[in-house]
Amino acid sequence: DGIAAMLIEPMMGNCCAISATTEFVQLARRLCDQYGVLLIIDEVKTGFRVAKGGIQSLHNVKPDICTFAKAMANGYPIAAIGGREEVMRTFRPGGAAHGGTYTAHSVSMAAAERCLQILDETPALATLAAYGESLKSGMKQILDRRGIVHSFSGHPSMFGLFFAPQPPNDYRAWKKSDYSFYDKLARHMQDNNIIVEPDSREPLFMCEAHDQSCLADTLRAFETSVDLTLEQVEEERRAS
């Protein structure tokens, strides 16, 4: 009786894109229905990126409330909340209050309208996923040739790279892992003109503007950076 809602992020946007299973997400839906609890899904990073219907559509689950931002306007500052009609009608004078930092930002609204139109009328999301698959495949070949154990988590359009046989299944597992190889690798990538997040928790995000030339540049820098990281690790081992 004391629980109003369950908030879940089926793909962790700030931790390697660690993903919940469909069974878990659907169980969350059933439990919320059973106990009269609202199910809220955080789609701030996955919405309009992994699928037109967001991560919820991939799990075939409808939340009571969901949140969107980021890809919705392709980088312009915007955020949105949506949900079941019964829930959304509570946001009214005399009902639940709601304010927004980006409320009535006309430029962002125009950008979002155009962005959603493009997503609806073109294969942009399929292009993102295909690019991500190619990037993962190239990375895998480079790492396999050097015998470096690794795994990927998340969706092709938004994935994490993890240096272990299996990706972590929650934040605590990531926290206990040795992510120092990625940290070193990321800095070498930056030195080779590929800007990646230096924190291994942040996934790699695909962009529809990236073409095959960008892919080739990224993989060349990745291969060079892997070798530099291996050299750095060996130097540190000898010095210790």
Where are these regions (language model features)?
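Conserved N-terminal phosphate-binding loop of PLP-dependent enzymes in the Aspartate aminotransferase
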Residues: 1-240
